[in-house]
Amino acid sequence: FKSTPLLSEMPIGSYVDYTATGGSIGSKKVTCSSGNSSCTGIIANSSNDGTYGYCKDEKYKYTTKGYRIAYMKQNDSSEKQAFLVSASSLECINNIENADTKAIKYCNLNYVDGDCSCQDNDNNGVCDSASSDVWSINDNDFYAITKEISGVGRKLTNFSSKLDAVNCDNTFSSKECGYNNDILDNGGYYYFNAKSNNNSIYWDPAVRSINTKESGSLGLRPVIKMSSNVVVTGGDGTINSPYTISNNDIIINDD
């Protein structure tokens, strides 16, 4: 057995003790300060009453917190990598126009293969395209998460991407589309970084499915692509005892 198991060997949905530190937008450094609770996965609008915060409507509070393993993929070297997602929303945003830019600060150089950066060729403080290390949850992530749930990936809507998959538009109480799976169905409102006929796509906790046309202050959920070398050093993967992690270049196998 492995004395230090890989994070990519852990179950989907496991909680991970991850702290964001920041990255860079072009040459500009952005940080997730130690005093900002969102860096450790504490939800927007959290309070001291034991609830997990909300965006848009206090009636729909998130049911979970921290960071979780959302799905796995193989890299070009055929090594599995774990993709983390914030368990709920780390901040509330008014639109998705700069969602990938806002996600940059939730990176951590210790756990990714890249440099936690995005290009900003015109130096306007906005990512020209998403970083390869961290981004706002999008249609490709939805496909990967729903594939982990049912074995068959789904896309958000017919118009949100060119993915060859059944879409989840106007589909309710469908486990294949995330219903009752708290990686997606997490109690609160949040945006997907995708559009359908120029309409925003979001998770609607009132119907527990995706919806479109909403505007206003909904949640941002960063996705982080972890290095294949990240190992588990402790914890049991639950919300109260998340896996603690380290990035080791060499994994020692015990016979």
Residue ranges of model-derived segments:
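Collagenous Gly-X-Y triple-helix signature in extracellular proteins
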Residues: 1-255
